[in-house]
Amino acid sequence: MKHIRTRFAPSPTGYLHIGGVRTALFSWLFARQNNGAFILRIEDTDVARSTQASVDAILEGLRWLQIDWNEGPYYQSQRMDRYREVIEQLVKSDDAYRCYCSKERLIELRNTQLKNKQKPRYDGFCRDKAPRQSNEPFVIRFRNPVEGAVVFDDLIRGTISIDNRELDDLIIARSDGGPTYNLTVVVDDWDMKITHVIRGDDHINNTPRQINILHALGAELPHYGHVPMILGPDGKRLSKRHGAVSVLQYRDEGYLPEALMNYLIRLGWAHGDQEIFSREEMVQLFDISAVSRSPAAFNPEKLLWLNQHYLKTVSPTIIAKAFATQLEKAGTDLRNGPSLEQVIALQAERTKTLKEMAQRSFYFYQEVRSYDEKAARKHLLATIVEPLQRVRERLASLPSWEKEAIHEVIVETAQLHQLKLGQLAQPIRVALTGDTVSPPIDATLYLIGRDSALKRLDHAIRFIHQGMG
């Protein structure tokens, strides 16, 4: 069997979005499960719009998702001489020709065709004319066959046939000599010995044109697979409002790479009713021919559900660095407090993203500067001062700071003052966190630590006294 070689070829004119990442994932999985090579190519011939920042974001996004590549990144901007060489080869073999048609003529041609309800296309005016000796500007067009059809077996859509009469003579070199997309991608796939081109279905109209150029070059054809687009929850093309944002924005919003990878593989592909896939299972089970031909709908709630699953199941040690980044972005000082791993283990059941977890965990690391007004009004009352003082004294005298002993102090104090457990736990919670929501109060006290907990109880008691005064 031929050595499988797939590629991902993004254009660095913007961010790496969800659709592009899913295409990269499918291509990467196909290579990995066939012990093949995954090639990364940067299509940066659009000099005006390509930026180094976009290149950096693409590489960073792929690395974050651990979509690794065997070769590259190759840059089209560094291969211009090769493209010019192939263009000259096509002209010499009479598979391409100079076109001197002016912009005005082409506009007039298009308007006439539209007026006559015809499909706009180049009419071949210069196709059989001899090259001029003047210095007039010209483009170079590929001489597309006028007979027969282009037939190929799409890995996802099955057999596709396009009549060559539907295709006009596309431009392969602009008037400044610069190669066009359909030329560069053909040369790259040929030179890099790509065996399987897996890409978005927005490229499907380019495929028959590229196949004809490959035929003219005497090149072996790769297999093609066109992945349907991703729609928003409203059934329309995915917008920024519904998730069409940079993959790095998901990282910055506190999603885990495992969750996003798992979510993307299920966008348009299924393996029975299985929802959770490890990376090993993805490589083992993914089947490109089983990808749906219909567009997939992006579901933000499903992604959140998966993210929480991985927050609960991935080792806290693996998540700790990303969690620290979220805490620091929220302005939390991490010099004091419990280990990040302890907080992650405690909060994973209660939060869906690392960003949310960080927002709800600041009180483990720094003093509470203020209380939620509604929470203080309801729970920090004069009647609770004595029970709080009792809890404070008992906690201070514990021989060791253990969660079970802390729990006993709260239960016994509640019984002594004839309070329900919640009637005592909530004021303690407000004193410790400034609000009414936290993990179990004994676990919260344990992680905050004895010294800080006693300070916060003292502060709450003073706050109540000031309100009484």
UniProtKB/Swiss-Prot annotation:
Binding-site list for ATP: 240
Catalyzed reactions per annotation: tRNA(Glu) + L-glutamate + ATP = L-glutamyl-tRNA(Glu) + AMP + diphosphate
Gene Ontology cellular-component annotations: cytosol
Short sequence motif named 'HIGH' region, residue ranges: 10-20
Subcellular location: Cytoplasm
One of the protein's GO biological processes: glutamyl-tRNA aminoacylation
Major site of localization recorded for this protein: cytoplasm
EC number: 6.1.1.17
Top-level EC class: ligase
Cofactor annotation: Zn(2+)
Annotated positions binding Zn(2+): 99, 101, 126, 128
Cofactor binding note of this UniProt entry: Binds 1 zinc ion per subunit.
GO terms for MF: ATP binding; glutamate-tRNA ligase activity; tRNA binding; zinc ion binding
InterPro entries on file: aa-tRNA-synth_I_cd-bd, aa-tRNA-synth_I_codon-bd_sub2, aa-tRNA-synth_I_CS, aa_tRNA-synth_I_cd-bd_sf, Glu-tRNA-ligase_bac/mito, Glu/Gln-tRNA-synth, Glu/Gln-tRNA-synth_Ib_cat-dom, GluQ/Sye
Function: Catalyzes the attachment of glutamate to tRNA(Glu) in a two-step reaction: glutamate is first activated by ATP to form Glu-AMP and then transferred to the acceptor end of tRNA(Glu).
Protein name in UniProt: Glutamate--tRNA ligase 1
Organism: Coxiella burnetii (strain CbuK_Q154)
